[in-house]
Amino acid sequence: MKRTWQPNRRKRAKTHGFRARMKTPGGRKVLKRRRQKGRWRLTPKVNA
């Protein structure tokens, strides 16, 4: 069986990136919560 984690930087950015979060109301809520919590990173690091 194929493993679930098949690294792909583009997919990671498109799914979890900052611009992807900003696109939807829910994504903006995620960023708001993470800012409130004081997270260093709002979105996963993507070195493309």
UniProtKB/Swiss-Prot annotation:
Basic residues bias (residue ranges): 1-22, 29-42
Gene Ontology MF terms: structural constituent of ribosome
Keywords: Ribonucleoprotein, Ribosomal protein
GO cellular component assignments: ribonucleoprotein complex; ribosome
Segments forming a coiled coil: none
GO biological process: translation
HAMAP family, per the entry: Ribosomal_bL34
Subunit structure as annotated in this protein's UniProt entry: Part of the 50S ribosomal subunit.
Name by which UniProt lists this protein: Large ribosomal subunit protein bL34
Organism (species): Thermus brockianus
Gene field: rpmH
